[in-house]
Amino acid sequence: MGTKSHFEETKAAVIDIPPAYNYIAVFLTFACNYRCSYCINYFEEEKFQKKTITGKEWTRALNRIKSRPDLPLTLQGGEPTLHKDFYEIVNGIRRDLGIDLLTNLQFDVNEFMKNVSPDRMKRKSPYASIRVSYHAEQMDPDEMIEKVLVLQKNGYSIGIWGVLHPASDGQVRDVAKKALAKGIDFRFKEFLGFYKGKLYGTYRYPDSLTMKNADRCMCKTTELIIGTEGSVYRCHHDLYQGFEPVGDIKDAAFRIEDIFRPCAVYGFCNPCDVKLKTNRFQKFGHTSVEIVK
């Protein structure tokens, strides 16, 4: 008799990722070591769910996903390494599922290397699997660079992304020069949101961020967005604002519906959903959602 698959053992439906999907966001926790003034998680009011599920619940649910080699699970937050079962989750996810990590690198590098093999977060990709967010108002750049070098020299796929906030643009660019000189991949991220009354960012639907009048529309995502309790959301706005989820990855019957959904809060979108950006192949012009009014 052959060995039963994970799906047969759990008697849960396989979660097929639609061909048009570009990203799988796994928000392990919203806890963070920092509180940056411009954090996109706090673009509007803080209403997102802070409860978390255990490592066993995460791995049981995530292992139902059937993805592609070019579409990993991206562990993020908050600071995902703060989840108490972080290493259990990383090492419990099926090996055929790729893993990327978004982090501020405020963890013990030696402990990380002891628990996570370099090959577990490495794949053929135009960007690093471990992506460090540099925030000038909170982080010591020299400490960050040294940690990145340690991981890089030990075979980890790692790079730094710096947010070009108007108040620290020059500082971020200076740190980038220092990192690049040491052989570190350093890239820039647009600042998204308002600063001194001005909206920053490049958006496909500029009137989706007026923050004045709510309008109706139909919206379809290209991302599987999983909140800290396993709930699945239409978009980042709904995740951060605590709106009703469209499903739960822990539900054995959950499947992704690649459809347009009605929305009544157009005008109050989250910048992450409507910004023009590169897709997972680093081709510019992608947007997380498609909106029809």
Identify the function of each model-found stretch:
Residues 1-20, 42, 236-293:
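Flexible mid-to-C-terminal extensions adjoining Fe-S/redox cofactors in radical SAM and related proteins
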Residues 12-40, 71-75, 222-230:
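N-terminal pre-triad scaffold of radical SAM enzymes
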Residues 23, 43-53, 69-83, 94-111, ...:
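Core AdoMet radical
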Residues 25, 29-32, 210-212, 256, ...:
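Residue-level signal for mature regions of secreted extracellular proteins and peptides
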Residues 60-68:
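A short, N-terminal amphipathic alpha-helix
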Residues 62, 87-90, 113-116, 144-149, ...:
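Generic structural signal for well-ordered alpha-helices
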Residues 67, 94-95, 153, 181:
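Residues at the C-terminal ends
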Residues 129-251:
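Radical SAM enzyme [4Fe-4S]-AdoMet core and its adjacent flexible, acidic
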